[in-house]
A protein has these predicted regions:
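Active-site metal-coordination/substrate-binding segment of hydrolases
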Residues: 64-146, 151-162, 335-336, 341-344, ...
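His/Asp/Glu-rich mid-to-C-terminal helical/loop segments that flank catalytic regions of hydrolases
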Residues: 223-240, 269-273, 319-326, 333-337, ...
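Acidic, glycine-rich active-site loops and adjacent beta-strand->loop/helix elements
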Residues: 76-78, 110, 139-147, 168-172, ...
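Zn-dependent metallopeptidase/amidohydrolase metal-coordination segment
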Residues: 7, 11, 337, 344-358, ...
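Substrate-recognition/cap regions that form aromatic- and gly/pro-loop-enriched pockets
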Residues: 342-432
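Acidic/His- and Gly-rich active-site-bordering loop/insert found
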Residues: 2-103
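Active-site-adjacent substrate-binding region
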Residues: 218, 225-249, 391, 395, ...
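Midchain, well-structured core segments that form catalytic/ion-binding scaffolds
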Residues: 102-105, 145-146, 151-367
Length: 487
């Protein structure tokens, strides 16, 4: 079965078109061209701005021209993650989709349902002749996954509507009314390389096939962080053997993805092969036991002997680096006392990459619904890395979205959901970033909610969309549009 055989047919057909367009974050020229071409083919007016956002304008259903204009919003980009054994060029290759029971997934890569299904449903609304709706402005932003370039650079003159439906949530049955703010902290560790000496045996230490996932939506699940697990082992090895040498460390990827894989090239004093391999065996058993409930038994940790490298990080730089990575705050840092069950503050040790012969770059990603708490955890990490001589920079923080429980839009959405499905939706704030807070700053008075179909394991190659939820999400979206048009 192909995804174009699924219902609602228009949504899946539009999503199928989107999967054929390479669209990793920061590489969206093809997606912009696709959206413009799609609008032209369907006779829709459109506008773009300097950063690459696209807005399509769809007339109201006849008779509803005076209804309030509704903004349907999704983001163009997708997280580009793949399994290590998969050959895939995100800049040129289409996503290969697979229907598997009640789920749609990709072949070894992220699916891009985040936020391709949101974009596809906005497109489907504009070409479905059977729907009732007022004027529609469909806003497709760029670079939501990293940098929020689209939301921050949006020309608000392109948008006249003051009711916005953000289609970028991942749990059907939940209406989101607020989100956390976030920022990245990037530490550059200056170091020197020297010739690798004799007298050491060299090993590649590798951890892979962790679940990873979204560093906001899934940070509370206790999943392993590949960078920290690797640094922990290196720290233990240094403690056991007195000294270790380090030639390379590569781990993680995007700031908002929990790292699934990391590897290092490490030297230990010669003659300790048996002890080192036994230590690795014990460590593997330990972390498998620790992570059994969060990860299952599918991830791997192993060591394999390698040839002596020509160059390595000078010895005096190794201990400060390994100790600091190991000691970096990671995971949930505080729970909300105002909203039971909501993560208030977190940090993700997102990536560690030795670059060239003179530096290691460590990227962490902080989130909090309390600005001062986000600043506090950022300051702690900054102090930690500056203490070993790093140059630390932070990006501009993304704006959180304060909940408005008195929203008229929220009340209408709750009524629609209850009438359709017979139970009340969950109404929550998220420990994840959405563009809504920025929209509210740029377009004061905007009434907003966020919702979407059920997606699992986003930002990882295990990402999948629950097919039955897409149909129910579509019913909810179209019913809500009709109710808003008739108010």
């Amino acid at each position: 079965m192909k995804i174009t055989d699924l219902k609602p047919k228009l949504v899946w057909e539009c999503f199928d078109e989107i999967t054929k367009v390479p669209r990793p974050t920061h590489h969206l020229d093809r997606m912009k061209d696709f959206l413009i071409g799609w609008a032209e083919r369907h006779g829709l007016k459109y506008a773009t701005d300097e950063v690459g956002n696209v807005v399509m304008y769809c007339p109201a259903t006849p008779g509803y021209e005076n209804a309030p204009t509704i903004v349907l919003q999704g983001h163009q980009d997708m997280v580009a993650e793949k399994r290590g054994d998969i050959e895939h060029d995100f800049l040129n290759d289409p996503i290969k989709t697979v229907v598997e029971g009640d789920w749609v997934r990709a072949e070894g890569t992220t699916l891009g349902a985040d936020n391709g299904l949101g974009c596809a449903s906005a497109m489907a609304v504009m070409i479905d002749p059977d729907l009732v709706h007022g004027p529609i402005e469909a806003l497709f932003t760029v670079d939501e996954e990293q940098g929020l370039t689209g939301a921050n650079g949006l020309d608000p003159a392109m948008i006249s509507g003051r009711i916005l439906l953000n289609l970028d949530s991942e749990e059907h049955g939940m209406i989101v009314i607020g989100c956390a703010g976030s920022m990245c902290t990037i530490a550059t560790y200056p170091m020197e390389e020297v010739e690798a000496p004799e007298g050491f045996d060299w090993y590649e230490v590798h951890i892979d096939h962790l679940k990873g996932g979204h560093s906001g939506m899934e940070i509370h699940l206790g999943r392993g962080n590949a960078n920290q697990l690797l640094a922990r082992f290196l720290w233990l090895a240094e403690d056991e053997f007195g000294t270790i040498m380090l030639s390379d460390f590569q781990g993680g990827g995007l700031p908002n993805a929990i790292p699934r894989e990391a590897k290092a090239l490490v030297g230990i004093p010669a003659g300790n092969e048996e002890a080192f391999e036994k230590m690795a065996e014990i460590y593997s058993a330990t972390i498998h036991d620790e992570l059994r409930l969060a990860e299952g038994d599918t991830f791997i940790f192993n060591v394999a002997m390698r040839e002596k490298p020509a160059r390595m990080i000078a010895e005096e730089y190794v201990n400060p680096l390994v100790s600091t990575i190991f000691g970096t705050p990671n995971g949930v840092q505080g729970m909300s006392l105002a909203v039971p069950g909501l993560v208030e503050t977190s940090s993700n040790l997102a990536s560690v990459h030795k670059e060239g012969d003179d530096k290691v770059v460590i990227t962490t990603h902080q989130r909090s619904s309390v600005d001062s708490k986000r600043e506090e955890i950022t300051d702690r990490i900054t102090a930690l890395y500056e203490n070993i001589g790093c140059v630390v920079v932070t990006n501009d923080p993304s704006v959180g979205w304060a909940p408005n429980p008195d929203s008229k839009l929220l009340k209408t959405a709750e009524e629609s959901f209850k009438d359709l499905f017979g139970y009340d939706p969950k109404v929550e704030a998220l420990h994840a970033g959405l563009e809504c807070g920025i929209f509210l700053e740029k377009m004061p008075g905007m009434d907003m909610i966020s919702f979407g179909p059920t997606l699992k394991d986003i930002h990882s190659p295990n990402e999948k969309a629950y097919i039955p939820s897409v149909e129910e999400y579509w019913k909810f979206l179209t019913d809500l549009l009709a109710r808003l048009a008739k108010q």
